[in-house]
């Protein structure tokens, strides 16, 4: 059997039902998991609570910055900080979960990339409508 498949099967066999359900959830909104004080990011208790209670499979809207998220250049994650911050949240989840399973980062780009420093384009469905030549 493939070593990767063996590893996955071993991991799944160690998981509780609650942990398996947690891997399927996107219950925590990434933009609500951290605070920023100048150049220092700290995780809010919400992240650890969610991780301990249910587990986390997906962190969505981590980089989102718009009026709805209340994230701005003073409070959000800037372009140059993205990679380091995503690595930081991955490390936090791995270090603070029983089996050390990393999370899937969902950037919610179906609405256009709503992140600081991103180029904004219309949503894919709107862009598709522009190619009707008749």
Roles of regions detected by a PLM:
Residues 1-134:
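N-terminal beta-rich core of secreted/periplasmic extracellular enzymes
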């Amino acid at each position: 059997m493939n070593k990767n498949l063996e590893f996955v099967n071993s991991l799944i066999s160690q998981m509780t039902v609650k942990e398996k359900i947690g891997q399927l959830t996107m219950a925590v909104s990434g933009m609500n998991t951290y605070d920023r004080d100048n150049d220092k990011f700290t995780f809010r208790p919400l992240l650890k609570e969610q991780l301990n209670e249910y587990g986390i499979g997906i962190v969505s809207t981590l980089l989102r910055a718009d009026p709805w998220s209340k994230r701005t250049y003073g409070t959000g994650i800037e372009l140059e900080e993205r990679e380091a911050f995503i690595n930081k949240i991955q490390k936090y989840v791995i270090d603070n979960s029983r089996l050390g399973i990393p999370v899937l980062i969902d950037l919610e780009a179906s609405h256009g990339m709503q992140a600081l420093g991103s180029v904004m384009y219309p949503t894919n469905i709107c862009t598709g409508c522009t190619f009707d030549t008749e």
